């Protein structure tokens, strides 16, 4: 396995400074944000698609630091009633760019439709009641399977071998059953981006999920989570309070190692090794208490320390 950093982890820095921090942290790969939910602060998708010199410049900057592209990230809302069409084009653009850069994997999200033709936002159904909600969910699955059958074929035509869905709440594909459902319908090009942070707050077991998914694990995000027990006790995990006030929330994203320690991360990495996963472990830093740079560096340091204790793991240029 190989340490990678998602470039939005250092979104406040210029591309030059961001790549310097990533290399300094000990990573050997980057997951490049190309648009969708991200503003893509380090690259311009249209320019890279149309300008070979711009692509060569990017590759040169990576090579100079001993970095490679582990994946392109186009996490998006492809069925959003307002911005869905735009995001579908971003996903297709990411697939085209991946082919030009000889990258075989994109990281994205399934999306979630609204509740009808006049919707203004998504409608995520997570509870099997009332019955009209279940009927809506069934219609949403038809729409989702149609869209991703088309997008998977488009990706295959452009050399994409893996489409990694982040198992993320507010999207139709968010857990093991939903991932396996869409993978069964479309095929093995579809797999999971396993991010433990989103699983923790829903009380899923990331290690059990790794074993259940097996070779359907296409990508891994390293992000931690910490519960605020006082707030959890009175508000529960379904907490709609803003991330701008972390002290008032039931849970918050944390730098790897600051929410869970070796008791989780060691068996998690061993589980990945056990299913034969030999790809990037990509840091995604969203810690409200750390700066972008410090959170990324601390996450890398912790992850490399844990990985160094796991036998026969090639995890960085230094180990």
Regions found by a protein language model. Give the residues of each.
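Active-site beta-loop-alpha junctions enriched in small/polar residues
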Residues: 6-10, 33-37, 74-77, 111-113, ...
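A structural motif
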Residues: 27, 98, 103, 160, ...
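Glycine-rich, proline-tolerant flexible connector loops at the mouths of alpha/beta enzymes
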Residues: 32-57, 113-117
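Active-site acidic/histidine proton-transfer and metal-coordination neighborhood
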Residues: 16-17, 21, 56-57, 61-64, ...
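C-terminal helical cap(s) of enzyme catalytic domains, especially alpha/beta-barrels
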Residues: 292-312
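Catalytic domains of carbohydrate-active enzymes, especially glycoside hydrolases
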Residues: 16-38, 102
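Acidic/histidine-rich catalytic cores of soluble enzymes
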Residues: 2, 29-30, 72, 134-258, ...
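Short beta-strand segments at enzyme active-site cores
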Residues: 31-32, 69-74, 104-111, 162-166, ...
């Amino acid at each position: 396995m190989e340490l990678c950093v998602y470039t939005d982890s250092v979104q406040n820095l210029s591309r030059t400074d961001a790549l310097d921090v990533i290399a300094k942290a000990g990573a050997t790969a980057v997951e490049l944000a190309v648009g969708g939910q991200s503003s893509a602060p380090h690259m311009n998708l249209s320019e890279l698609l149309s300008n070979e010199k711009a692509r060569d410049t990017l590759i040169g900057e990576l090579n100079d630091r001993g970095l490679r592209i582990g994946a392109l990230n186009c996490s998006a809302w492809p069925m959003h009633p307002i911005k869905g069409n735009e995001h579908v084009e971003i996903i297709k653009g990411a697939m085209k760019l991946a082919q030009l850069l000889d990258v075989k994997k994109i990281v994205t999200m399934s999306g979630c439709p609204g509740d009808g033709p006049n919707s203004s936002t998504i409608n995520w159904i997570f509870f099997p009641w009332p019955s009209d909600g279940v009927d809506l969910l069934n219609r949403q699955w038809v729409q989702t399977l149609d869209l991703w059958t088309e997008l998977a074929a488009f990706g295959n035509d452009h050399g994409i071998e893996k489409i990694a869905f982040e198992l993320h709440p507010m999207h139709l594909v968010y857990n093991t059953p939903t991932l396996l459902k869409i993978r069964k319908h479309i095929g093995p090009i579809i797999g999971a981006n396993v991010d433990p942070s989103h699983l923790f707050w829903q009380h899923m077991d990331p290690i059990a999920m790794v074993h259940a998914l097996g070779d359907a694990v296409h990508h891994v995000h390293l992000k931690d989570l910490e519960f605020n027990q006082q707030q959890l006790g009175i508000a529960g995990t379904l907490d709609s309070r803003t991330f701008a006030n972390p002290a008032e929330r039931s849970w918050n994203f944390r730098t790897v190692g600051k929410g869970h320690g070796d008791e989780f991360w060691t068996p998690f990495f061993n589980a990945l090794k056990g299913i034969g996963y030999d790809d990037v472990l990509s840091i995604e830093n969203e810690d409200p208490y750390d700066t972008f740079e410090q959170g990324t560096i601390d996450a890398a340091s912790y992850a490399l320390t844990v990985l160094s204790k796991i036998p026969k793991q090639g995890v960085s240029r230094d180990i």
